[in-house]
Amino acid sequence: MADLVTYSNADHNLEQALITLKKGTQLLKYGRKGKPKFYPFRLSSDEKSLIWISSSGEKRLKLASVSKIVPGQRTAVFQRYLRPEKDYLSFSLLYNGKKKSLDLICKDKVEAEIWIGGLKTLISTGQGGRSKIDGWSGGGLSVDASRELTSSSPSSSSASASRGHSSPGTPFNIDPITSPKSAEPEVPPTDSEKSHVALDNKNMQTKVSGSDGFRVSVSSAQSSSSHGSAADDSDALGDVYIWGEVICDNVVKVGIDKNASYLTTRTDVLVPKPLESNIVLDVHQIACGVRHAAFVTRQGEIFTWGEESGGRLGHGIGKDVFHPRLVESLTATSSVDFVACGEFHTCAVTLAGELYTWGDGTHNVGLLGHGSDISHWIPKRIAGSLEGLHVASVSCGPWHTALITSYGRLFTFGDGTFGVLGHGDKETVQYPREVESLSGLRTIAVSCGVWHTAAVVEIIVTQSNSSSVSSGKLFTWGDGDKNRLGHGDKDPRLKPTCVPALIDYNFHKIACGHSLTVGLTTSGQVFTMGSTVYGQLGNLQTDGKLPCLVEDKLASEFVEEISCGAYHVAALTSRNEVYTWGKGANGRLGHGDLEDRKVPTIVEALKDRHVKYIACGSNYTAAICLHKWVSGAEQSQCSTCRLAFGFTRKRHNCYNCGLVHCHSCSSKKAFRAALAPSAGRLYRVCDSCYVKLSKVSEINDTNRRNSAVPRLSGENRDRLDKSEIRLAKFGTSNMDLIKQLDSKAAKQGKKTDTFSLGRNSQLPSLLQLKDAVQSNIGDMRRATPKLAQAPSGISSRSVSPFSRRSSPPRSATPMPSTSGLYFPVGIADNMKKTNEILNQEIVKLRTQVDSLTQKCEFQEVELQNSVKKTQEALALAEEESAKSRAAKEAIKSLIAQLKDVAEKLPPGESVKLACLQNGLDQNGFHFPEENGFHPSRSESMTSSISSVAPFDFAFANASWSNLQSPKQTPRASERNSNAYPADPRLSSSGSVISERIEPFQFQNNSDNGSSQTGVNNTNQVEAEWIEQYEPGVYITLVALHDGTRDLRRVRFSRRRFGEHQAETWWSENREKVYEKYNVRVSEKSTASQTHRDRDEEEEDIPH
């Protein structure tokens, strides 16, 4: 059941309680036959009857016939299945002259208080203010304002009720709570954090049930909203449904305790789910921002929730809020009528026409309209230019705000970039300023986009029959990019400009997105303009340059409401159906997936709901549905899968929420179900409740592990040992006494509200020591056992969640007394010191754990990065290796092909292919470039050859001759350089390699003058190249124009040949060389002397 939010106004609190009763809940009903069963109970709209749906149909109990309300399990019907542990959650309504009773058990303590207090108020009012609650002194449930309200969780709500003589007119009076200010986000309460309930003669405390303390922002339970008659709409309550990217109460802690920061997570809700609130609300209007939302109830109260940033929630505290929370500072002074949310601020309009703003003002001087960049954490009224004006509505963009007065005057303020304020310039306005170009005209609607604004302005139109009527025309201004202004171009407009393409239509509502504008005519037609991305225009044929009509499924519908998110649109028709289209990320369209929709598509999950209002946030959507009570037909089908019960599909009740489910949807069991007879046994729960209870169990286990006795340091261990020695003398008897009390309480199986941890100054220390020894602090705080017999033997009295007078002896319940317990003062002091030591050790160990965890996370990230880099390097190496292998194979193949071609040439055929395309000759040598410079690979090859062949030897054709003189070398070099261009295929490759290499060589100096002349004649030389005959032997050949070849020189490697070895080799292999290369041989081929020319060697060999 929902928790109470406290107010200072008694009428508000009474109305809040009645709203809760009208919405109803699942209660466990006892009968005269059979076992107890779950039924939905609610209060009728006229507040005169109590209605529930049983297996035989709807039943009613008129409150006028109820003569008495009896808390506890005292009737004979309860005795059939007595559950003492649920005594404080039970009550009975006696009617028909106390002859019959309606016996019920509530889910938790707060729910019981609301039902008992609300029914008591109605019965007392109906019977002249005479109280009918047994044991109550005629007063209602009220609050002692002088007492301090306590809570064990930041998000919990507590109330203190006093048993006094309050007037019947104000029976349900609860004071507001001031939550502690903290920079940490609001952490959901857990089962281990439930405060112990202390009862005395004057006060009691209420706390949210542990089973409901851990909640997600949206509920998985199906709502009972459905279509109803128009006559009931005024009395129906408003439920909020929400879908898209929604804030979740799973908080992630980053860093160690000293520098810890908290990250609030968000979850994607793909279909509409009812918003789960800590209170039961009647929502009238809702507004959605980027990371927060707000709504206004029918009672004029404003609630906000979401991620806190600069005070935009208005609670005055710097922490996130997961469930709607009352903005107390504004509700206490004014009744709110309208609310709007921007990205960093929030605006609210009261019934008195006052405008309040709050939020982060540091982003822009004029964002809040107060003339400064100061952030306001609570609502602040805007005066100045609005003094004396009645504000009717307001619209918020990320950086500017627009408002309309009751007389239709339009004011804007904030950042004026792109002329978004409509004042004819781009200046920032710090206070609300009227748009002068629309002065004298009545503005009926306005909407703020990111950098553009749109408004509907009434224009007097003269008809053909000379009559004048007012018609709403669409005006836009600001940034014209993406055609969002609808003027057919992308130019900005600094002042409001009427959209000419829509001049013939009568508009009355407008909405703006990021790059989108949507208008609604009085005839129910929807026009869109702007970017076509994600299909947000809802028309497949448009290019977005001009406004287009949204038809398709809306062609036969009458649209009543429209709303825009950043990139999606929602429309509400007259048949209360919701259509959405545009971007589908995060499930913001509500169709159960993440797909975009380019045409309007109905939201099936809301098809059987009566929707009365819609609102879009940046990436989520919300709707207000009229709440209708569960019908008999809905009781005959599963609350989750909506399938009807039958012979094979049996119905089961969830022991946590009480709703009916089939076996498939409630096949799991869990401990600590709210409506379970025993918390220590497994009971059937639905799937959604199982998830919630599992989370609570996990948190409890974590808390138990954290509360275990830590390993002590040396200094603290010595201190603890000394304390144990002092306690050993007399501590045994006291611990035995506590164990005996626990064993008796376990047999009795009851909980007490009077055995409080805060009642006696000595008992808390004993209990704390016991918790430290048993490593079970959380369990001890959650359930302090009730004793069956008081040690002092005093007379027992009844115990109930409400403080009241003694009941008759027959219904008395034993209560413990602490008067018989006595412990020396030294024990309490020693246990306090021990507890402090343990707490210090826990803090140290937690700090170490957080530090090590953080280091481990960093190292894991670094390891992942290293592995990723290694994989990338291996992939790159493998790729390069594959390329290298392929290149080598290609080279080998080309060389083999070239050799085959050379072998096939007939004798005497000139060789035309002196080099390959890649610059390699047949033997793999690289030719230099045309400019005389060699490539790097050629240079390396040339250098290698030069290093192994440093000697030059000259020879005559078929004979040895004198070496060339040094002065002949330049001529030979010149001759060689001039011979190469004769072949066009060699001209691109430059001179041959022999120009740079003049190693151990023989020159062909034939005595045949004609032969020598033929070689030296540059006109007869066609090509020259070098070939390797065998390792260490390099042959220089010349191709002549007549098709013959001549041998120019032979070079030998110094590493393989000496001077005489080279001469010997040549004399032995000369004929073979001539025969192999088909070189003409001179008739005079006698060898001549050979000598070594050192000067030529030094000149030709490169250094």
Swiss-Prot record:
Zn(2+) 2 binds at residues 654, 657, 686, 689. Residues 22-123 form the PH domain. The keyword rRNA processing does not apply. Residues 151-169, 217-231, 791-818 have a biased composition (Low complexity). Mostly expressed in flowers, and, to a lower extent, in stems, leaves, siliques, seeds. Zn(2+) 1 binds at residues 638, 641, 662, 665. Pfam families: BRX, BRX_N, FYVE, PH_12, WD40_RLD. RCC1 repeats lie at residues 237-298, 299-351, 353-406, 407-458, 471-522, 524-574, 575-626. One of its GO terms (molecular function) is zinc ion binding. A zinc finger (FYVE-type) spans 632-694. Residues 144-233, 783-818, 962-988, 1079-1103 are annotated as: Disordered. Keywords: Coiled coil, Guanine-nucleotide releasing factor, Lipid-binding, Metal-binding, Repeat, Zinc, Zinc-finger. Gene3D superfamilies: Pleckstrin-homology domain (PH domain)/Phosphotyrosine-binding domain (PTB), Regulator of chromosome condensation 1/beta-lactamase-inhibitor protein II, Zinc/RING finger domain, C3HC4 (zinc finger). Residues 962-979 have a biased composition (Polar residues). It comes from the Eukaryota. Residues 1023-1078 form the BRX domain. Residues 828-904 form a coiled coil. Binds to phosphatidic acid and to phosphoinositides such as PtdIns3P, PtdIns(3,4)P(2), PtdIns(3,4,5)P(3) and PtdIns(4,5)P(2). Catalyzes guanine nucleotide exchange on specific Rab proteins. This is PH, RCC1 and FYVE domains-containing protein 1. The gene is PRAF1.
